[in-house]
Regions:
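Glycine/proline-enriched, intrinsically flexible loops and inter-domain linkers
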Residues: 1-262
C-alpha cells in the first residue's frame, strides 16, 4: 500500500522481506530437537509466549509469499538474520522478532508530487470494512512482547486480505493511467487507521469526516475502535467533486468498495 500511495498514485511491482529472530533451533520432522549447533548454545532456550522463532520463520515466509502471489506482486528477494549474543552479564537476541516488508515500484514524473487540498474536495476511502483488527498495532509492535495483556497484544495483530488490496489497487492504477489523473492526494491506511490516513490527507487545510459513512463490519466497535483500527487493504484519496462520479464508475467496475466520508 505504501507504494500505491506515492505522489498521487503509483505502481507496486515486486515485494521483498527480511526476517530477524533469535536462533530457531530447528526441530526434525518427527518433532524431536536435534543436537544444538555450537553457536546455538550461547543462551539457554527460552519459553516463547506466542510462537517459536522456527514457527515465525516458516509462517511469516509462507504468509508473505502467499499474499504477494495472490495480490500479483511476487516476493523476489529478501534476507534472514538470526542472532543471539552474550557479553559479560548482558544478553542480546532478536527475541522481539522483526519482519521488514518492502518492495519495488514506480511512478510517473507527472504524478510524483501530491496536490494541494482545496475546499470542496471529497475524502474517499477505498477498500474493506472496519473490524476489531490491529488496534494499537503500531504501538504494540514498538515495545517488548508481554508488556501488555494477551488480549491487547492479539487485537493489535493485523490480518491480510490480498483480494481486497487487488481491487483497491486496480482502481488506483486505472486512475493514474488516465490522461488526467483525478487524484489530488492519496495515503495508505497503516498504523492508527483512519485517524492517521485521513488526517494526513487534510493536514494542510483541515477537513470534516462523517464517521457514519465509514463502512462497519463489526457493529460492536466503539468510536475509538472505528477510527483507529488497522483493518488492512484500504486507501484514502482526495478527489475533486467534479470527478467523483467518474471515479465511482471505475470502482464499481473493479468491485472496489468506495465510500465518500468527508
Amino acid at each position: 500500500r505504501d507504494r500505491m500511495g506515492g505522489g498521487v498514485g503509483s505502481w507496486p511491482i515486486a515485494g521483498t522481506a527480511v526476517y530477524m529472530t533469535a536462533y530457531p533451533r530447528l526441530t526434525e520432522d518427527d518433532g524431536t530437537t536435534p543436537a544444538l549447533r555450537d553457536w546455538e548454545d550461547i543462551l539457554p532456550v527460552r519459553q516463547w509466549l506466542y510462537q517459536t522463532p522456527e514457527q515465525i520463520l516458516i509462517k511469516a515466509s509462507n504468509g508473505a509469499s502467499d499474499f504477494g502471489n495472490k495480490f500479483g506482486q511476487p516476493l523476489i528477494t529478501g534476507s534472514l538474520l538470526t542472532f543471539e549474543h552474550q557479553e559479560n552479564s548482558e544478553k542480546y537476541a532478536y527475541d522481539k522478532v522483526i519482519m521488514l516488508a518492502g518492495g519495488v515500484g514506480y511512478g510517473t514524473k507527472r504524478d510524483c508530487l501530491k496536490g494541494e487540498p482545496q475546499a470542496g474536495n471529497k475524502v474517499v476511502v477505498v477498500g474493506g470494512d472496519n473490524y476489531r483488527i490491529g488496534l494499537g498495532g503500531g504501538s504494540v509492535s514498538s515495545v517488548d512482547t508481554g508488556r501488555y495483556s494477551n488480549g491487547i497484544e492479539l487485537n493489535a495483530i493485523q490480518r491480510a486480505n490480498p483480494e481486497m488490496q487487488k481491487r483497491a489497487y486496480n482502481l488506483v492504477r486505472a486512475l493514474v493511467e488516465e490522461d488526467n489523473n483525478p487524484v489530488v492526494s492519496i495515503h495508505d491506511h497503516g498504523s492508527a487507521g483512519h485517524l492517521n490516513c485521513l488526517s494526513e490527507l487534510v493536514e494542510e487545510c483541515g477537513g470534516k469526516i462523517d464517521m457514519t459513512q465509514l463502512p462497519i463490519g463489526d457493529k460492536t466497535l466503539s468510536a475509538k475502535e472505528i477510527i483507529a483500527n488497522e483493518s488492512q487493504e484500504r486507501m484514502g484519496l482526495l478527489i475533486d467533486e467534479k470527478h467523483l462520479d467518474h471515479v465511482k464508475k471505475i470502482a464499481e467496475r473493479e468491485r472496489a468498495p468506495m465510500y465518500v466520508v468527508g
